[in-house]
Amino acid sequence: LFQLELKNIPKSFTRLAQRFGPVFTLYVGSRRVVVVHGIKAVKEVLPGPQGRVLGQRRHPAFHAHRDRGIIFNNGPTWKDIRRFSLTTLRNYGMGKQGNESRIQREAHFLLEALRKTQGQPFDPTFLIGCAPCNVIADILFRKRFDYNDEKFLRLMYLFNENFQGLSCPWLQLYNNFPSLLHYLPGSHRKVMKNVAEIKEYVSERVKEHHQSLDPNCPRDLTDCLLVEMEKEKHSAERLYTMDGITVTVADLFFAGTETTSTTLRYGLLILMKYPEIEEKLHEEIDRVIGPSRIPAIKDRQEMPYMHAVVHEIQRFITLVPSNLPHEATRDTIFRGYIIPKGTVIVPTLDSVLYHNQEFPDPEKFKPEHLVDESGKFKYSDYFKPFSAGKRVCAGEGLARMELFLLLSAILQHFNLKPLVDPKDIDISPVNIGFGCIPPRFKLCVIPRS
């Protein structure tokens, strides 16, 4: 434990990997942790044969979600519920035209809200977050919130506070010593309180859906899960329960809001730091889309620079640098090492996204990392911000689409204006734990003529 820098655990893992190699064991208290570092080892352990014996490590702060849902579920229901949720998400437009139109509709409301700032400084944390939150709310609840709705803003505040809380040093300690620290004051108490409040809100929505459910005409993903529950209500072994559905929907609501929101916000800060990159994006948008047509996914083919910038933002910030910690569900052997059941396994994504041969000067923000010599977008097999294998992010397709369409729409209509000289903008994260937390900032958005 004392070899870890709690404010930047991924940095500690990198330092230890340089000393001990790509696979090493450390003990946090009595807990055995195996860190897997570097592209070769990570690709072996996630999509490879070992991926089949990896479960999700239970997170003490999310004890209320224990063995339910799809994020921190390590129980027997996880595989089937995840598979059904993914299929239903695809049916509701995941990566297809259905979600494209959802995002385009929401982009209209986001642009209107940005215009109302009238060029004055504002904190983008919740305003920018409204768009991805409404997109996932429509998929889950067939509901759209007004940007000034108090409950809407409260939910986004809880999502944001939990993402930051999970990344603070105290939570890193609590995750490894929950029995010792549970009764002490600390940020773990706030996270658990927030989890309970989010779950209560989602539970109310699920109950409302159940009361008005038409099994022949499901309105959204929540209805689809409830239909499955009704199908097996006479079964001895039930996969779907009201509480399980609530946790699954809450997982998707949190993940579908906060990750995309934080990435967009961090992206705006980076673009203000590098106005020459923003200018190149304006030129590409003007040439391909023009001033009035709403951006579409088909534009990606003609906008390699925007496509590269969106990917480079994700690579550079490495939103979840140490991945979601996994756990060996049975004894296994990896690279000749015996890994006992219950061992925590950490496949580090930052070691892949910051690979210095694939991405020269990886600590620098360079869209050229993903552009080839002819100026076309260059896909990299090292681009793994959504993880890999059976636990890959369920919303990867939706997130990719949101980032491209929303960022394109913002830059189509606005110039970003920082409150300080670009060279004085600090784009270093304020905390790196579960997630990579960007600094708070204000900006102005100036309508383009």
Swiss-Prot record:
The omega-1 hydroxylase activity is stimulated by cytochrome b5. PROSITE patterns: CYTOCHROME_P450 (PS00086). Keywords: Endoplasmic reticulum, Fatty acid metabolism, Heme, Iron, Lipid metabolism, Membrane, Metal-binding, Microsome, Mitochondrion, Mitochondrion inner membrane, Monooxygenase, NADP, Oxidoreductase. Its EC number is 1.14.14.1, 1.14.13.n7. GO terms for biological process: epoxygenase P450 pathway; xenobiotic metabolic process. It is found in: Endoplasmic reticulum membrane; Microsome membrane; Mitochondrion inner membrane. One of its GO terms (molecular function) is iron ion binding. Pathway: Lipid metabolism; fatty acid metabolism. Its main location: endoplasmic reticulum. Coiled coil: none annotated. It is a peripheral membrane protein. It catalyses: an organic molecule + reduced [NADPH--hemoprotein reductase] + O2 = an alcohol + oxidized [NADPH--hemoprotein reductase] + H2O + H(+); (5Z,8Z,11Z)-eicosatrienoate + reduced [NADPH--hemoprotein reductase] + O2 = 19-hydroxy-(5Z,8Z,11Z)-eicosatrienoate + oxidized [NADPH--hemoprotein reductase] + H2O + H(+); (5Z,8Z,11Z,14Z,17Z)-eicosapentaenoate + reduced [NADPH--hemoprotein reductase] + O2 = 19-hydroxy-(5Z,8Z,11Z,14Z,17Z)-eicosapentaenoate + oxidized [NADPH--hemoprotein reductase] + H2O + H(+); (4Z,7Z,10Z,13Z,16Z,19Z)-docosahexaenoate + reduced [NADPH--hemoprotein reductase] + O2 = 21-hydroxy-(4Z,7Z,10Z,13Z,16Z,19Z)-docosahexaenoate + oxidized [NADPH--hemoprotein reductase] + H2O + H(+). GO terms for cellular component: endoplasmic reticulum membrane; mitochondrial inner membrane. It comes from the Eukaryota. InterPro entries: Cyt_P450, Cyt_P450_CS, Cyt_P450_E_grp-I, Cyt_P450_E_grp-I_CYP2E-like, Cyt_P450_sf, Cytochrome_P450_fam2. CDD domains: CYP2C-like. Heme binds at residue 393. Disulfide bonds: none annotated. Its cofactor is heme. Interacts with chaperones HSP70 and HSP90; this interaction is required for initial targeting to mitochondria. A cytochrome P450 monooxygenase involved in the metabolism of fatty acids. Mechanistically, uses molecular oxygen inserting one oxygen atom into a substrate, and reducing the second into a water molecule, with two electrons provided by NADPH via cytochrome P450 reductase (NADPH--hemoprotein reductase). Catalyzes the hydroxylation of carbon-hydrogen bonds. Hydroxylates fatty acids specifically at the omega-1 position displaying the highest catalytic activity for saturated fatty acids. May be involved in the oxidative metabolism of xenobiotics. Belongs to the cytochrome P450 family. This is Cytochrome P450 2E1. It comes from Macaca fascicularis (Crab-eating macaque). The gene is CYP2E1.
